[in-house]
Each structure stands twice: as C-alpha cells, then as structure tokens.
Regions:
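A conditional alpha-helix N-cap/helix-loop micro-motif detector
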Residues: 17, 56, 85, 114-115
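Helix-adjacent hinge/juxtasegments
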Residues: 49, 57-73
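Structural beta-alpha unit
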Residues: 69-104, 111-112
Length: 137
C-alpha cells in the first residue's frame, strides 16, 4: 500500500517527534516501505549545522541511526531554505514530490491560542499534499 514514507524531522528538537518516528517505523515494517527523513535547514550556520553540506551529513547519519534502531530501510534528505521558519510548509510540499513519497507521517503539537492566527505545519501539509498525511500527536 505504501512504498516511500516521508517523515519531516527537526534535528534540533527530536524528543517531540518520538511517537511519529515510531509510528512511521511500524508502518514501514508492515508495508516493507522505505522511510525518507526530510529536514529543512538554512544555508547559514545554525544550531544543528554550520553549512548545508554538514546538515546533509547529519540527516544521513540520523537516517542510518533510525534504520539500525527500527530495522527498516531509510534515507536522509536535507532541504535548504533561505528562511526555514516561514518557508517550511512549501519546502516540505516540494520534498513530497522530490522524494516520491506516497505517505507523510509527521508529528503534531499541542494546540494553543496561536493556532487561531497561524495554521499548524501538519494541518497545512495535510490540506495541500496530494498524498495521504498522518499527523501524530
């Protein structure tokens, strides 16, 4: 049913992603799918990496570690954006097509007052993606 599961990750904030990571791994095992972890970073130095090449290396290392932990096939893809905070949703939607995903599994957040003014990333991806999206809270 699914062959390529895209999982957006923020390497600077992995703890809140735990349930989504485990869910994606379970689905990948069930369907024999590959998990493609996608991270979006800036071209400028940040808390995770000093440059896009280092960020790509860290994404690959993260994917390899997840493959070992969960026993699934993985890939790590680093996307670069001039402003990841404001450009995250469009960049992730481009990644869906770029990696050939047929399912997105992503973490949600606890809803709060700001959701009335700014939509959540998961909600935006679910509304605009042409493939199935599972938002895990």
């Amino acid at each position: 049913m699914f062959t390529r599961i895209m999982v957006p990750v923020d390497l600077a904030h992995l703890e809140p992603l735990d349930r989504a990571l485990r869910c994606a791994a379970d689905l990948a095992k069930h369907y024999g799918a590959v998990i493609v972890y996608v991270g979006v970073g800036a071209a400028t130095p940040g808390s995770v990496a000093h440059n896009p090449q280092e960020f790509a290396q860290k994404m690959s290392e993260f994917a390899e570690a997840q493959a070992e932990v969960h026993g699934v096939s993985t890939e790590g893809v680093a996307m670069t954006s001039p402003d990841p905070t404001t450009d995250l949703d469009p960049t992730l939607l481009k990644a869906v097509d770029q990696v050939g995903a047929d399912l997105v599994v992503m973490a949600s957040h606890i809803p709060n007052l700001t959701d009335y003014f700014w939509p959540s990333n998961g909600g935006t991806i679910a509304a605009k993606a042409k493939i199935s999206v599972m938002v895990v809270r």
